[in-house]
């Protein structure tokens, strides 16, 4: 330093002054202060050259900036910043034993997400990610979306099945549309016949009663006819060389005209 010479010069006179002072004090009993030239010593310490602290200040500033960049680059795994400002992402593949280049990105977050995707592909669930919460949230949202899509698909299938089932009115409309000339037939008479047959089974049959009446009348007529034949068989003209049966047969046959009423 520039003041080193002054200090060295200042120390030597002090020792000399002490030794001389002691001797003068001892000899004369009075201390001589003339040997202490304080103003002169301070004048020698003053210097016109200013102290320069800018170099050390610049050194600390550059160090803090580099520390900030290092902290920012080390905040995420598998990324580093290029000198021109872009961010590079890469990951080590343990199977191949090489570092896989993932590309350069505009922001550190984009590079970190690219690293996360490749890490999940290589290491699976054991991968250490930069955004673990974000990936789990995405998986939950994806699972929920898939479940919602499946439920909507099942609902659409149910609606399609219900809507595809044709109703009777639709069938009638289609039949009428395809067959415009078809006449509408009233089937009420068929229902009346069916209902009438069912009622007749429970009611008494008039035809059977009529048949019974006819049979009784026929039996009465036959009985009367037999009585008449017996009457004719007892008449005197039937007596002769022919028996009664022959005379009766000849009477009905009309072969021999007999003047019964003459």
Curated annotation (Swiss-Prot):
Q: What is this protein called?
A: Ethylene-responsive transcription factor ERF073
Per the record, the major location class is nucleus
- GO biological process: any one? response to anoxia
Q: How is it modified after translation?
A: In presence of oxygen, the N-terminal cysteine residue (Cys-2) of ERF73 can be oxidized by cysteine oxidases, thus preparing the protein for N-end rule pathway-mediated proteasomal degradation. Under low oxygen levels, Cys oxidation is prevented, ERF73 is stabilized and confers tolerance to hypoxia.
UniProt miscellaneous comment? Seedlings silencing ERF73 exhibit reduced elongation of the primary root. Seedlings overexpressing ERF73 exhibit increased elongation of the primary root. Plants overexpressing ERF73 exhibit increased tolerance to hypoxia treatment.
Q: Which UniProt keywords apply?
A: Activator, DNA-binding, Ethylene signaling pathway, Nucleus, Oxidation, Stress response, Transcription, Transcription regulation
Q: Which organism is it from?
A: Arabidopsis thaliana (Mouse-ear cress)
Q: Give the subcellular location.
A: Nucleus
Q: Which domain of life is it from?
A: Eukaryota
Origin organism lineage? Eukaryota, Viridiplantae, Streptophyta, Embryophyta, Tracheophyta
Family named by the database record: Belongs to the AP2/ERF transcription factor family. ERF subfamily.
The free-text tissue note of the record is:
Expressed in roots and at lower levels in shoots.
Residue positions of the PTM Cysteine sulfinic acid (-SO2H)? 2
Record region (Disordered): 56-79
What's a Pfam family in this record?
AP2
Per the record's keyword annotation, is Kinase included, yes or no? no
The UniProt annotation gives the DNA-binding region as 75-132
Q: Which GO terms describe its cellular component?
A: nucleus
């Amino acid at each position: 330093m520039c003041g080193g010479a002054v200090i060295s010069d200042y120390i030597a006179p002090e020792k000399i002054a002490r030794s001389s002072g002691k001797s003068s004090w001892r000899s004369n009993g009075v201390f001589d202060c003339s040997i202490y030239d304080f103003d002169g010593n301070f004048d020698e310490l003053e210097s016109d050259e200013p102290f320069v602290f800018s170099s050390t200040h610049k050194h600390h500033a550059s160090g803090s900036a580099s520390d900030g960049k290092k902290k920012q680059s080390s905040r995420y795994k598998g990324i580093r910043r290029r000198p021109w400002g872009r961010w590079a992402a890469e990951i080590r593949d343990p199977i191949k034993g090489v570092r896989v280049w993932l590309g350069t990105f505009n922001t550190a977050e984009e590079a970190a997400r690219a690293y996360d995707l490749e890490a999940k592909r290589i290491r699976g669930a054991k991968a250490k990610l930069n955004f673990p919460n974000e990936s789990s949230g995405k998986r939950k949202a994806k699972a929920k979306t898939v479940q919602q899509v499946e439920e909507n698909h099942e609902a659409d299938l149910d609606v399609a099945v219900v809507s595809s089932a044709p109703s009777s009115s639709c069938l009638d409309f289609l039949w009428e549309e395809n067959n415009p000339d078809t006449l509408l037939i009233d089937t009420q008479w068929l229902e009346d016949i069916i209902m009438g047959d069912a009622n007749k089974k429970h009611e008494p049959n008039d035809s059977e009663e009529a048949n019974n009446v006819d049979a009784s009348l026929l039996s009465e007529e036959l009985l009367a006819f037999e009585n008449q034949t017996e009457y004719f068989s007892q008449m005197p003209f039937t007596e002769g060389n022919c028996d009664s049966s022959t005379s009766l047969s000849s009477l009905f046959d009309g072969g021999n005209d007999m003047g019964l009423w003459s």
